[in-house]
């Protein structure tokens, strides 16, 4: 924008108001709050446009909507055009949007000119409040509703003038008759005229009375319509915002769901990899019978997948039929007890792996149908596959591994379930059957079945969902060690061949027993000293944190009023700078005037000073003369005294 326009605005309005400061930055792109402050300051100082705005509109906090801002500026533009009579091309909508700063400056310049010329704005304010609007060419327009009664009044006035003209013509025609007839006729005509005029005046008064409420109603109707439109626009905007927020939430939920699915898949993949690693490790240590067991386990897993799928579908149907208020704890206990009984009986009675797996699955499926609670049992049994996989020696543990792996496969997605051996895979190594190993394994079933049951009980009672990721190298929990103590140690130690997991559990049990031994008295004292020192440090740290919290709170409390003060500092500094410049200019002017006066007085005093010096010289001369005369007088007196003295002496002689 041109700097000359800003300069003109500063010159026009700077003589009227001092606040807000008329800086180039604000005038180059004036915001609505700045214009509102200028107009309210003009009204407060000069009284121009007084009564145009209500008390609520005079406060900028109440004028925040776009429609309110536009109406505020439109009133000011109409009044300025009516008072000045000059056209204004400024549009309030463009001004509110921050466009057309030059036209905005023209409006401010016209306001300043009207205030400097002291033009009255009372009539213009009344007309604007009545609904009239100023044309961009400087003419006055009225609203369509306000024009209708005015058009009626114009027509009525025209009809009155026509009637009066007709009457005057009749009077002129009758004037040709005698004078006395004229007087009588004039008297007779004047009476009905006066009556008609009185009637017309009364009618006009009634019409005006009727017009005023109609105008008020029209204004109220327009205001209500504008408010209703604004409300509708706000409602639409709010609905659009709500829709957008809902869409964003749906997108976030979808993205979160996708992320959770990906995380679950990653976890499942990691579990599968860990299991494969453990199996590969155990496979290296075991012999050919273990390979045969793994093959048989694969076959049994296929069967178990089919049976568990049927059991799961039946349990889902049963869970929908049953009510949610049933006692879940008792049912879970019944489920765990029945499953344990069925597993132990299957381990002790049936030697073949292929026959035990489907029977256990059938028992478990029937139990699920009776109790209709599938999820807790699945979670409880989901902890034991890692334990069963760690043990590669007894056949009973392999049976457990079959059933538990089948149940875990239901929890995993279909893509991550154990896939049967494909047809394109290389042929399996030849099986070498040894009767001695099978006999020893069959003999070991009675001893190892009990240990497996204890492990299953522990997995059922554990509530930690992360136990599915059990690693062989990690130490077991205290609850597991306590239950292992319940098992007779003689049965475990007598067996020569134990699984890797049982050995690890025994080692951790021994370590735990060593840790359980009573500590030394010196260690107790050290621990007490460390605890007391730790408590002191904790108290000191908590006190420091409390002090820091209090200081932060006080800082925040003082920062808010300080920030409010800082908003007004710029305005105050600008005003003080302007005032300082004004006083500096006045000081310069007075100094120049003083120097001029001093030069004038000096020029006027110089001849007087010369005269004064001359008079002083004359005074000195006269004083010298007086002194000389006095000296002569004294000399003469001495002479006289001598002469008198000599005369006295001579007379005495």
From Swiss-Prot:
Presence of keyword Transcription regulation: no
Keyword entries, A-Z: Cell projection, Cilium, Cilium biogenesis/degradation, Coiled coil, Cytoplasm, Cytoskeleton, Phosphoprotein
Major localization listed first in the record, in broad terms: cytoplasm
Domain of life assignment: Eukaryota
CC per GO annotation: axoneme; centrosome; ciliary basal body; ciliary base; ciliary tip; ciliary transition zone; cilium; intraciliary transport particle B
Polar residues bias spans: 448-462
Any one Gene Ontology BP term: kidney development
Disulphide-bonded residues: none
Molecular function GO labels: microtubule binding
Phosphoserine: modified positions: 437
UniProt region (DISC1-interaction domain), positions on chain: 229-653
One Pfam family named in its UniProt record: MIP-T3_C
Region of interest (Disordered), residue spans: 134-467
Record's compositionally biased regions (Basic and acidic residues): 145-305, 325-335, 370-384
Keyword Transmembrane helix listed: no
Subunit text: Component of the IFT complex B, at least composed of IFT20, IFT22, IFT25, IFT27, IFT46, IFT52, TRAF3IP1/IFT54, IFT57, IFT74, IFT80, IFT81, and IFT88. Interacts with IFT88. Interacts with IL13RA1. Binds to microtubules, TRAF3 and DISC1. Interacts with MAP4.
Function (record text): Plays an inhibitory role on IL13 signaling by binding to IL13RA1. Involved in suppression of IL13-induced STAT6 phosphorylation, transcriptional activity and DNA-binding. Recruits TRAF3 and DISC1 to the microtubules. Involved in kidney development and epithelial morphogenesis. Involved in the regulation of microtubule cytoskeleton organization. Is a negative regulator of microtubule stability, acting through the control of MAP4 levels. Involved in ciliogenesis.
Annotated family: Belongs to the TRAF3IP1 family.
Name assigned to this protein: TRAF3-interacting protein 1
